[in-house]
UniProtKB/Swiss-Prot annotation:
Domain (WAP) ranges: 26-73
Subunit structure: Monomer. Homodimer. Homomultimers. Interacts with SEMG1 (via 164-283 AA). Interacts with LTF. Found in a complex with LTF, CLU, EPPIN and SEMG1.
N-terminal signal peptide: 1-21
Lineage: Eukaryota, Metazoa, Chordata, Craniata, Vertebrata
Cross-referenced CDD domains: Kunitz_eppin (cd22611)
Protein name: Eppin
Tissue and organ expression note: In testis, expressed and secreted by Sertoli cells, appearing on the surface of testicular and ejaculate spermatozoa. Expressed in the spermatogonia and the earliest preleptotene spermatocytes. In the epididymis, is expressed and secreted by epithelial cells and covers the surface of epididymal spermatozoa and ciliated epithelial cells (at protein level). Expressed specifically in epididymis and testis. Isoform 2 is expressed only in the epididymis. Weak expression is detected in myoid cells as well as spermatogenic cells.
Impact upon substituting C123A: Does not affect the binding of SEMG1 or LTF. Does not affect the binding of SEMG1
One Pfam assignment: Kunitz_BPTI
Function of the molecule: Serine protease inhibitor that plays an essential role in male reproduction and fertility. Modulates the hydrolysis of SEMG1 by KLK3/PSA (a serine protease), provides antimicrobial protection for spermatozoa in the ejaculate coagulum, and binds SEMG1 thereby inhibiting sperm motility.
GO molecular function terms listed in the Swiss-Prot or TrEMBL record: serine-type endopeptidase inhibitor activity
GO biological-process terms attached to the record: defense response to bacterium; negative regulation of calcium ion import; negative regulation of flagellated sperm motility; negative regulation of peptidase activity
Additional record remark: Might be used as a target for male contraception.
Origin: domain of life: Eukaryota
Amino acid sequence: MGSSGLLSLLVLFVLLANVQGPGLTDWLFPRRCPKIREECEFQERDVCTKDRQCQDNKKCCVFSCGKKCLDLKQDVCEMPKETGPCLAYFLHWWYDKKDNTCSMFVYGGCQGNNNNFQSKANCLNTCKNKRFP
């Protein structure tokens, strides 16, 4: 197959990606887990150990002091504050995009979302230097 054959194949993949949606492009160009250094006061319980344990094509990534299912198309720093339905009392931090700062909140200990950090330093390290439109 010459260079024109490869070019035709590439054009076909691009067209299929536009028609089929993100599934094909994710297969061709998989997204990677974020690499963020964090200092953890304690190791959190892992939600997953492998990608197949995550729903909705999320990836199992080391994030915020434990393994969690992340939607790599969604920025955790843009998620709202969620305390979760449980009644524990953990002082955690979340990133408020509107104010461009990390604020303390009471996390109930379960569920919620991934905009949830053990320390202000971890929150700032993950979210502060991002450029938002």
